[in-house]
UniProtKB/Swiss-Prot annotation:
One of its GO terms (biological process) is DNA strand elongation involved in DNA replication. Gene3D superfamilies: 2.20.28.10, mini-chromosome maintenance (MCM) complex, chain A, domain 1, Nucleic acid-binding proteins, P-loop containing nucleotide triphosphate hydrolases. Its EC number is 3.6.4.12. ATP 1 binds at Y344, G383, A385, K386, S387, N488. InterPro entries: AAA+_ATPase, MCM, MCM7, MCM_CS, MCM_dom, MCM_lid, MCM_N, MCM_OB. This is DNA replication licensing factor mcm7-A. Ubiquitinated by traip when forks converge following formation of DNA interstrand cross-links. Ubiquitinated via 'Lys-6'- and 'Lys-63'-linked polyubiquitination by traip. Short ubiquitin chains on mcm7 promote recruitment of DNA glycosylase neil3. If the interstrand cross-link cannot be cleaved by neil3, the ubiquitin chains continue to grow on mcm7, promoting the unloading of the CMG helicase complex by the vcp/p97 ATPase. It comes from Xenopus laevis. Component of the mcm2-7 complex (RLF-M). The complex forms a toroidal hexameric ring with the proposed subunit order mcm2-mcm6-mcm4-mcm7-mcm3-mcm5. The heterodimer of mmcm3/mcm5 interacts with mcm4, mmcm6, mcm7 and weakly with mcm2. The N-terminus is required for interaction with mmcm3, though this interaction may not be direct, and remains in a complex with mmcm3 throughout the cell cycle. Begins to associate with zmcm6 at the neurula stage. Component of the replisome complex. Component of the CMG helicase complex, composed of the mcm2-7 complex, the GINS complex and cdc45.
Amino acid sequence: MPRDYQTEKEKCKTFLQEFYKDDEIGKKHFKYGVQLANIAHREQVALYIDLDDLAEEDPELVDAICENTRRYTNLFADAVQELLPQYKEREVVHKDALDVYIEHRLMMEQRGRDPNEMRDSQNQYPPELMRRFELYFKAPSSSKARVVRDVKADSIGKLVNIRGIVTRVTEVKPMMVVATYTCDQCGAETYQPIQSPTFMPLIMCPSRECQTNRSGGRLYLQTRGSKFIKFQELKIQEHSDQVPVGNIPRCMSVYVRGENTRLAQPGDHVGITGVFLPMLRTGFRQVVQGLLSETYLECHRLVKMNKSEDDELGTEELSEEELRQITEEDFYEKLAASIAPEIYGHEDVKKALLLLLVGGVDNSPRGMKIRGNINICLMGDPGVAKSQLLSYIDRLAPRSQYTTGRGSSGVGLTAAVMKDPVTGEMTLEGGALVLADQGVCCIDEFDKMMDTDRTAIHEVMEQQTISIAKAGIMTTLNARCSILAAANPAYGRYNPKKTVEQNIQLPAALLSRFDVLWLIQDKPDRDNDLRLAQHITYVHQHSKQPPSQFQPLDMKLMRRYITMCKRKQPAIPEALADYLTAAYVEMRKEARTNKDMTFTSARTLLSVLRLSTALARLRLEDVVEKEDVNEAMRLMEMSKDSLLGDKGHTSRTQRPADVIFSTIREMVPEKGARSVKYSEAEQRCVSKGFTPAQFEAALEEYEELNVWLVNQARTKITFV
């Protein structure tokens, strides 16, 4: 059915002028009228027409826009251009070069024109040159996001809504929209609107004067009078869960212009609304590939999406009720247990993973960067759910990458030099660690990686950058990500007869870069095995964790809370400095006496600081407290105990009471009163992984032996 586009334009005008929504007090709020006033005064550039609003007024017009988007974009733009003078209440203060250029031309033309001749002087200017705004459509909420491979020939020219992951982003460059030429003979100006990616510049002057005199004036391009717009090309690829069995993920080129540029980075999950169009080939390529045509998506709206759900990346604050739900008592245990609730046990491992998601605080004293991100290595026997924990963290983190050891080369992890198909230049393409910037990079089967590829990670784990010198490109890329690695011991299973170094077989330089190295052993234990088997069979039957008193938190809620925690920048107070120093010296002393311990260096102290600041962030506090340091020390101690296994308990004194006694004895000052504060002794023992009940039992036992006395107020332990 043929359409009268003039009446359609009038409909567009009516909608822009008359559409309103009632606010809370019942007052009419003209949504687009306010935006038109902002555009008229140059306070706003992009105007987004929400098709849900238009559907309330005229559903037929919405269908027409979705079918023939390019035409209606121009109709709406013309309607806005005609309406702008009504909304202009004052002169624009800051004029750009094009304003001055056009005003000057209008004045020159009025002087040289016959006063009796009635003619609109702006007619000769193309509408694209006069527009100072961009117009885009926002797809109706009823339209479902499509997969890249479902966008086919029947979608050409229509408004489509697709989801995918950005794999490549070009630099933003100026793109010519209107070319302005000046004649060297008559001085007349000629304008050439450009629609396609390439164009043939005009050479001969088409003005009446040159045609009459046959002077053959030549045209020269005036860049000051031409109009340019920002242009960027994205490559998006469909999600791995959208790819059919045995197929390779499909890609699509997206052309982004104006205000939509610089919104996405490689690795972002995005939803794009745009017009699906064929690419017009000209020149030599048309001769070579005359029958083939490329397609692309002209972007109208680009939003970042969550990784696993279809909703936009929520930046809204948590409500008070949601905060109360999270921060009730035992919230630390509750948050940790909400990580992979289907997996049984591993409470301390989950706590460490929670701290990895929150992260510590970055420090940059005088340009030297001390990282805040926490790196964790999970090592263990086969079948202890290491990979499941990794894949859950990959889904939970707002920004993450998942790779495996054998499937990743050093270049694939860091950066590769590629040839740009558009310009032919050599460009850098970021690998998994660059794509996971400000997020988490999960590397499974870490022990299976080639040594040459593993060395690529060393710089990232401490300096958080990737330095490149390839193909004439010398640069440094940011890779501020936490690394979560999972590895199997050297002999398939952990061999208790071998030392820790022989079992792990990773270089000390790499091990010291991991803040927490956790060994998860699969030891036979009847009660534990029974509970685990019941848990697994229930999960297998019902596809959810067994019912319990504890209700795990929703993944979306956790993601928003973690984002909120990351905004905090807690500092370590002066009062805790001595306590931390003493604790570190104690750890070094213990490492010296126990030959089988992991490598303890100054990085271990930094690890404690990172874990402490992450715990303070989790409580939404600005200052680190003693409890945070004790919990950080406890986690470090538990991870070391996991490495020592049975050997550790035999190498130490057998009973916990004896270890607690030696710990308290070491706290006694060499000179002065032979007494220790009760609270300090308890904190030191708890930080070493003992429970308060074990501490109390040891006190009573040695008090009966008359080794020490505890006063009635239980504030002081005095040695006899």
